Amino acid sequence: MTDRPRLRLHDTAAGAVRDFVPLRDGHVSIYLCGATVQGLPHIGHVRSGVAFDILRRWLIALGYDVAFIRNVTDIDDKILNKAAAAGRPWWEWAATYERAFSAAYDALDVLPPSAEPRATGHITQMVELIERLIEKGHAYTGDGDVYFDVLSYPEYGQLSGHRIDDVHQGEGVASGKRDQRDFTLWKGAKPGEPSWPTPWGRGRPGWHTECVAMAHEYLGPEFDIHCGGMDLVFPHHENEIAQSRAAGDGFARYWLHNGWVTMGGEKMSKSLGNVLAIPAMLQRVRPAELRYYLGSAHYRSMLEFSDTALQDAVKAYVGVEEFLHRVRVRVGAVEPGEPNPRFADALNDDLAVPAALAEVHQARAEGNRALDSGDHEGALRQARSIRAMMGILGCDPLHERWETRDETSAALAAVDVLVRAELQNREKAREQRNWALADEIRNRLKQAGIEVTDTADGPQWTLGGDGK
């Protein structure tokens, strides 16, 4: 797709959907706050990766060259505490779980970032940023730490809407702070913890400083889009903006935030003990099915997890997969075509994936009708469009990444012929009002794991029954 229709995105800073206009025509720069690698990734972590991978794929489909940066926070209080409790070196602990996150992203075919900087690899840039803030009067030292002076930056709170009088950083009381609303840029060295030399003494970086330094290093002082979970709006992203602008730079021009994965209405988190780790989830469903599920809701919506919702997503994905395989068996090769205009309209409307998926399933229904009526050209046209649309969503069933059924194509063809014959017999029985025979045929198919749905266009069949 070379023509670029108007893309509109919800900007948290504006509190509204805005036309997206990149800094440089044809180029888009994106920074996504990545993982703090303290433990196994769960579906709440990975949802942001999937959501903004769809954004990236759509921008690429629109013809943009996309620079996509996703950082790794590999030094943090939680990492240090967990490593110490386990009797392991902190760097080994971080490296172990960084690999686990990489494996999770790869399993769900999240495109690798253009660069994936680690916090510990950019200490020099962080120190330079803090020095600039001190020189400009926006930061100060206290008891070996360095803090950002919130009152020195009058625009503080513009992203989150927090009034300065109501600010609580969640850092606890610190003796070196002039004001408890200030936040930490640098933590003074403590016995047994890693530390780096600076003009104000040894120590390690604060979380909020890390992302500013790495975003500047890879995307420059001003870039297009900053992404992350909605829980990062305050204080993390608010504090990033304050540092960058107080230092005399710009920062992100659009802020996109995804909703949480919830269970029982509560955010999925390790502290609540309600997490579903990616390795465990991949024992329950295939990676493409999990990706489909995580990407199926609007990115700004909460995604309430339930087994029923997960299985509904699996059934929907399998329905698309089976249609594409039926077309390939009956008609031949199915190459990706073009997404239909309504799909494009949906994604251009703040990545409205539910509406986009509705177009996928409408195309599947039309394609099945065409296939059953012998209109192979019409079925192929819908199948090619579906491949394009599902590819943009990152879960095209016929893509080599997800293709697991080549070896069963011949068997699927045989099943299709046999099921069609049975359904024809069932239709004859229904015409003759022989309901007992019609039910017997349907039950026989169900016992074989084949679900039959009667529609206005005739019976449709899918695999997926449990044979019970």
From Swiss-Prot:
Motif residue range(s): 'KMSKS' region: 267-271
- Single GO term (MF): zinc ion binding
Where is it predominantly found? cytoplasm
Q: How is the cofactor bound?
A: Binds 1 zinc ion per subunit.
Key word Hydrolase present in the record? no
Task: Name the residue ranges of motif: 'HIGH' region.
Answer: 35-45
Lineage of the organism:
Bacteria, Bacillati, Actinomycetota, Actinomycetes, Mycobacteriales
Q: EC number(s) on record?
A: 6.1.1.16
Protein's name in the database: Cysteine--tRNA ligase
Catalytic activity of the protein = tRNA(Cys) + L-cysteine + ATP = L-cysteinyl-tRNA(Cys) + AMP + diphosphate
For the ligand (Zn(2+)), the binding residues are 33, 211, 236, 240
User: Required co-factor?
Assistant: Zn(2+)
* Known partners and oligomeric status: Monomer.
Annotated InterPro entries: Cys-tRNA-ligase, Cys-tRNA-synt_Ia_DALR, Cys-tRNA/MSH_ligase, Rossmann-like_a/b/a_fold, tRNA-synt_1_cat_dom, tRNAsynth_Ia_anticodon-bd
Which PANTHER family does the entry mention? Answer: CYSTEINE--TRNA LIGASE (PTHR10890:SF30), CYSTEINYL-TRNA SYNTHETASE (PTHR10890)
Q: What class of enzyme is it?
A: ligase
Binding of ATP, residues: 270
**One CC-aspect GO term:** cytosol
Q: Which Gene3D superfamilies match?
A: Cysteine-tRNA ligase, C-terminal anti-codon recognition domain, HUPs
Q: Please give the family membership noted in the entry.
A: Belongs to the class-I aminoacyl-tRNA synthetase family.
User: Which keywords does this Swiss-Prot/TrEMBL entry list?
Assistant: Aminoacyl-tRNA synthetase, ATP-binding, Cytoplasm, Ligase, Metal-binding, Nucleotide-binding, Protein biosynthesis, Zinc
Q: Which domain of life is it from?
A: Bacteria
| Gene giving rise to this polypeptide | cysS
